[in-house]
């Protein structure tokens, strides 16, 4: 059987695609603990970008905002409207929390498409968006759960737990299960969408490295923004629900 060089090249390309792996991690050993270094490094980069942008934009605030200050005031107004719509008139104290969630997830998602993480080589695994890792999304979801429990308990006290037996005690197991499914759905939805988007781009770049991946990358940017909005909206809705009562 004759195997042409073209066939060998095609087979090699398919083999390279089949070698795309997930789940490879780079750890730091600190004392008796293993720290997931990839997530920490990329999260620090995202936090630095956010803090640096805010400091530069508002270092000299003007009565009539211009440029960066105007942009961040627009973002703040958007987050305030989102919080007020979902939480109600008592939204004020929760704007920083919802805003932090939205901005961190938004910049994290976009960093996976816009920052050249791949050029930084690690002993194991590779750098990617923080939200590309299940540890990050689970942590964000658990923070959201803690926030809506705190919101309900701070407003209603122990009577908050009456929601589990409303409208009838028969629904107690379902109402308890609902509180477990909320963080699960939040974390896996965000993780799955971001991971799938990055894998699709990697495979397309391996197949056709020039033009074809570009529309998919733009679609990924749009999807990343939508996922950040969905997470922040649901977080605010859960907080509002815990303060108002069971729906």
UniProtKB/Swiss-Prot annotation:
Pfam families: ATP-synt_A. The chain crosses the membrane at residues 38-58, 95-115, 134-154, 199-219, 220-240. Its main location: plastid. Keywords: ATP synthesis, CF(0), Chloroplast, Hydrogen ion transport, Ion transport, Membrane, Plastid, Thylakoid, Transmembrane, Transmembrane helix, Transport. GO terms for cellular component: chloroplast thylakoid membrane; plasma membrane; proton-transporting ATP synthase complex. It is found in: Plastid, Chloroplast thylakoid membrane. CDD domains: ATP-synt_Fo_a_6. It is a multi-pass membrane protein. InterPro entries: ATP_syn_F0_a_bact/chloroplast, ATP_synth_F0_asu, ATP_synth_F0_asu_AS, F0_ATP_A_sf. GO terms for molecular function: proton-transporting ATP synthase activity, rotational mechanism. F-type ATPases have 2 components, CF(1) - the catalytic core - and CF(0) - the membrane proton channel. CF(1) has five subunits: alpha(3), beta(3), gamma(1), delta(1), epsilon(1). CF(0) has four main subunits: a, b, b' and c. Belongs to the ATPase A chain family. HAMAP family: ATP_synth_a_bact. Key component of the proton channel; it plays a direct role in the translocation of protons across the membrane. This is ATP synthase subunit a, chloroplastic. It comes from Zea mays (Maize). The gene is atpI.
């Amino acid at each position: 059987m004759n195997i042409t060089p073209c066939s060998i090249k095609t087979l090699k390309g398919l083999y390279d695609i089949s070698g795309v792996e997930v789940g490879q991690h780079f750890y730091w050993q600190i004392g008796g603990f293993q720290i997931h270094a990839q997530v920490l490094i990329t999260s620090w980069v995202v936090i630095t970008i956010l803090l640096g942008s805010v400091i530069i934009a508002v270092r000299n605030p003007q009565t009539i905002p211009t440029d960066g200050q105007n942009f961040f005031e627009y973002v703040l107004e958007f987050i305030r409207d989102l919080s007020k719509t979902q939480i109600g008139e008592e939204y004020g104290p929760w704007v920083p929390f919802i805003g932090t969630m939205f901005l961190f997830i938004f910049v994290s998602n976009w960093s996976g498409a816009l920052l050249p993480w791949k050029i930084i080589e690690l002993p194991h695994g590779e750098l990617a968006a923080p939200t590309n890792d299940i540890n990050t999304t689970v942590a964000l979801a658990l923070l959201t759960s803690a926030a809506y429990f705190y919101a309900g308990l701070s407003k209603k006290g122990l009577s908050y737990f009456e929601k589990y037996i409303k409208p009838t005690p028969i629904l107690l197991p379902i109402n308890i299960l609902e509180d477990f499914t909320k963080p699960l759905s939040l974390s896996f939805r965000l993780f799955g969408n971001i991971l799938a988007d990055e894998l699709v781009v990697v495979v397309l770049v391996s197949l056709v490295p020039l033009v074809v991946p570009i529309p998919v990358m733009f679609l990924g940017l749009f999807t990343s923004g939508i996922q950040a909005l969905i997470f922040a909206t649901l977080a605010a809705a859960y907080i509002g629900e815990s303060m108002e009562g069971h729906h």
